[in-house]
Amino acid sequence: MKEVDLGKSLDREMSLWRYMSIDKFIDLLSNQKLFLTPLAYYQSSDPFEGFVPKVAFEATMKIFIDRIEEAEAAGVEIEKLLRERVSSPTTEQLEAIEKMKAMSKAHRESLIPLNNKISKSTCVHCWYHSESESEAMWKLYSDSGKGIAIKTSVAALVDSLNVCNQDVPLRLGRVKYLDFLSNELTPKDCVIDGATSPLLKRKEYEHENEVRLYSVPQLMTAERWESYEPRPILVKVDVSSLIENIYISPYVGEPFTSSVRKICELLGVPNEKVINSKLLENYEKMLAGFVKV
């Protein structure tokens, strides 16, 4: 059984929010699965998704290029020794040498496309970190104001996944926001919770304050990656332990509010977990309730 690999930047008590439309909420309750989206699918909203700053990309490429050059140097040495010790190498020996050279060339040519393919195929499920509701998140992720927000914690999210028998590796980490074009960035700046691309975004998106659950397809070989097309991953989750509270959008009234409560009742969510957002509640009335005159 695979358990979630929890990033060190996260505290288990941190509050997390997931804002969504009612149809996605019903789908979650009905199917008991989280939808992880390939980074490739976010191209329209953020063309930099799946990419890293130049300094991080160069450092990553250097690691792989160094390995290729080590293999090439070993190949050159083998060929040199062979020609020194054997006056007339056999056809099979010469073919083996040429095959090594061709493999090295292919590895070099596929290095950047393969790196991009792996990054774009990484699947993520995003949560907003805050101890309170966010007016901006309501507007961004509800359907014309008709939406709900699930409130949970890092601990509840991890535990709700771990009780299910996961068949894909899952990691949870906090997104780091950087100026991708800054000349002062170092490779170390571009690592968070042991990862780069799935947990790096531009500073322009810092308002999202994201915590990401993510998974990288385990294909292993370059040949399999070449034919792979990014696709979503569905992971099982125990919704009853995931949900601490459900908040109903502050931009709606009846019959939406009672409809959400009925849906929750039918799908097994206790009524005491369902809360009407007080984000836009009349503050003058609230003050009157605070002070007795």
Regions inferred by a protein language model and the residue ranges of each:
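Partner-binding and oligomerization surfaces adjacent to conserved cores of proteins
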Residues: 1-293
